[in-house]
Curated annotation (Swiss-Prot):
GO terms for biological process: translation. InterPro entries: Ribosomal_bS20 (IPR002583), Ribosomal_bS20_sf (IPR036510). Binds directly to 16S ribosomal RNA. Belongs to the bacterial ribosomal protein bS20 family. This is Small ribosomal subunit protein bS20. GO terms for cellular component: cytosol; small ribosomal subunit. PANTHER family: 30S RIBOSOMAL PROTEIN S20, SMALL RIBOSOMAL SUBUNIT PROTEIN BS20C. HAMAP family: Ribosomal_bS20 (MF_00500). Keywords: Ribonucleoprotein, Ribosomal protein, RNA-binding, rRNA-binding. GO terms for molecular function: small ribosomal subunit rRNA binding; structural constituent of ribosome. It comes from Protochlamydia amoebophila (strain UWE25). NCBIfam families: S20. Pfam families: Ribosomal_S20p. The gene is rpsT. Residues 1-27 are annotated as: Disordered.
Length: 96
């Protein structure tokens, strides 16, 4: 006897419901990226407190990378990303 797999039938949805589902997905992705940014910034600030220049430089590069990805995906606006990067670079320069 062969296995019978029941495929989920596509359901025709009203546009408002579809937009709601898409917004939930986007909201979840945005939340994930924002959390990654906060975690990376926190680890960068901790490395500044420790005073390890090589570690803080690596952490700063990591934060830059995540912020650039967020700007590319539209999670943050470009101006916010630039402002955040500038402030973090200023903190790194002040500690150096």
């Amino acid at each position: 006897m062969a296995k019978q797999e029941v495929a989920a039938k596509k359901v025709k949805r009203p546009t408002a419901l579809k937009r709601d589902l898409q917004n939930k997905k986007k909201r979840l992705n945005n939340k994930i990226y924002k959390s990654r940014v906060r975690t990376a910034v926190r680890s960068f600030q901790e490395s500044l407190v420790k005073g390890d220049e090589t570690l803080s430089k690596a952490k700063l590069d990591e934060v830059y990378s995540i912020l650039d990805k967020c700007a590319k995906k539209g999670v943050f606006k470009l101006n916010k990303v630039s402002r955040t990067k500038s402030r973090l670079a200023a903190r790194a320069a002040a500690k150096a």
